Swiss-Prot record:
Protein name: Photosystem II reaction center protein Z
Single GO cellular component term: photosystem II reaction center
Family matches, as PANTHER family: PHOTOSYSTEM II REACTION CENTER PROTEIN Z
Role: May control the interaction of photosystem II (PSII) cores with the light-harvesting antenna, regulates electron flow through the 2 photosystem reaction centers. PSII is a light-driven water plastoquinone oxidoreductase, using light energy to abstract electrons from H(2)O, generating a proton gradient subsequently used for ATP formation.
Main location (coarse class): plastid
Organism name: Helianthus annuus (Common sunflower)
SUBUNIT field: PSII is composed of 1 copy each of membrane proteins PsbA, PsbB, PsbC, PsbD, PsbE, PsbF, PsbH, PsbI, PsbJ, PsbK, PsbL, PsbM, PsbT, PsbY, PsbZ, Psb30/Ycf12, at least 3 peripheral proteins of the oxygen-evolving complex and a large number of cofactors. It forms dimeric complexes.
Length: 62
């Protein structure tokens, strides 16, 4: 269970880092938002899911 929690936290940190760099790049590019809207929404949905997963796993561990 601890390994699953650690992997979920790592995935959350990695996704946060990717979104931290990727979202401003998408907004700064001329046609970035219209062509990459689905990617940004998918990344945000993944991030929200990981936040809930980390919270659930944390409550099971402690």
């Amino acid at each position: 269970m601890t390994l699953a929690f650690q992997l979920a936290v790592f995935a959350l940190i990695a996704t946060s880092s990717i979104l931290l760099i990727g979202v401003p790049v998408v907004f700064a590019s001329p046609d970035g938002w219209s062509s990459n809207k689905n990617v940004v929404f998918s990344g945000t949905s993944l991030w929200i899911g990981l936040v809930f997963l980390v919270g659930i796993l944390n409550s099971l561990i402690s």
